[in-house]
UniProtKB/Swiss-Prot annotation:
Full protein name: Casein kinase I isoform gamma-3
Cellular location(s): Cytoplasm
Organism field: Bos taurus (Bovine)
Biased composition (Polar residues): 12-21
Broad class of enzyme this protein falls into: transferase
Catalytic machinery residues: 148
Entry EC no(s): 2.7.11.1
Catalysed reactions, as listed in the record: L-seryl-[protein] + ATP = O-phospho-L-seryl-[protein] + ADP + H(+); L-threonyl-[protein] + ATP = O-phospho-L-threonyl-[protein] + ADP + H(+)
Length: 276
């Protein structure tokens, strides 16, 4: 998708709406209908009024208790224009919100999984794996760990777009620098960390409260690949009275499930999970 002509960066003019009452982000982007939501706030369809191109606009309340949009914007800038990294067109205020304008993408891997009756062939999963291991390698090369592997966070390009076959990685709100920018050293090993990520896919060490590193992203990818191959994972659907107890049960079941059982009939996936 071509880059809109508007400036990419912080909005020093503070525009949030026009005199006509249309909600705007910066001088270019008109805010449209809601197309999604999350812990950060909501996702809106937007339009670049100079180019007539559609965009995605993430809105986060300025009074958010745990603001992460500006950090996510910084991480996108750190990642640059690598394959499968969405373009970020703008960051700035929008009324009572902080707004980030991004390239509009197509459906997620979870959407496609549903469309395929929740069955992906081995060939399809291997094609996905090749792209996503490469994508994660690129993220790691920029001194970031992702920490939020789930099918909903991997999107193909829009239909008819030249990037339609490219799987993009989105949502860096939980990402973290694993190389200290001052010392240039790997962050220290720590324990008793709170859980970060999606319990279904996160690594066993994450359940154990250990500081995440690159291997945890790769293990989480392995769990996601097996989800696609099996249709579900052994630790799905566990009942518990509280979220904490449920996370504990998921972690216990992961540890109790041998890799050979998880990856039955897929020995190469077992080799991958043992390796990471």
């Amino acid at each position: 998708m071509a880059r809109p002509s508007g400036r990419l960066g912080h909005n020093t003019r503070g525009t949030g709406s026009s005199s006509s009452g249309v909600l705007m982000v910066g001088p270019n982007f008109r805010v449209g209908k809601k197309i999604g939501c999350g812990n950060f706030g909501e996702l809106r369809l937007g339009k670049n009024l100079y180019t007539n191109e559609y965009v995605a606009i993430k809105l986060e309340p300025m009074k958010s208790r745990a603001p992460q949009l500006h950090l996510e914007y910084r991480f996108y800038k750190q990642l640059g224009s690598g394959d499968g990294i969405p373009q970020v067109y703008y960051f700035g205020p929008c009324g009572k919100y902080n707004a980030m304008v991004l390239e509009l993408l197509g459906p997620s891997l979870e959407d496609l999984f549903d469309l395929c009756d929740r069955t992906f062939s081995l060939k399809t999963v291997l094609m996905i794996a090749i792209q996503l291991i490469s994508r994660m390698e690129y993220v790691h090369s920029k001194n970031l760990i992702y920490r939020d592997v789930k099918p909903e966070n991997f999107l193909i390009g829009r239909p008819g777009n030249k990037t339609q076959q490219v799987i993009h990685i989105i949502d860096f709100g939980l990402a973290k620098e694993y190389i200290d920018p001052e010392t240039k050293k790997h962050i220290p090993y720590r324990e008793h960390k709170s859980l970060t990520g999606t319990a279904r896919y996160m690594s066993i060490n994450t359940h154990l409260g250990k500081e995440q590193s690159r291997r945890d992203d790769l293990e989480a990818l392995g769990h996601m690949f097996m989800y696609f191959l099996r249709g579900s994972l052994p630790w799905q659907g566990l009942k518990a009275d509280t979220l904490k107890e449920r996370y504990q049960k998921i972690g216990d079941t992961k540890r109790a499930t041998p890799i050979e059982v998880l990856c039955e009939n897929f020995p190469e996936m077992a080799t991958y999970l043992r390796y990471v």
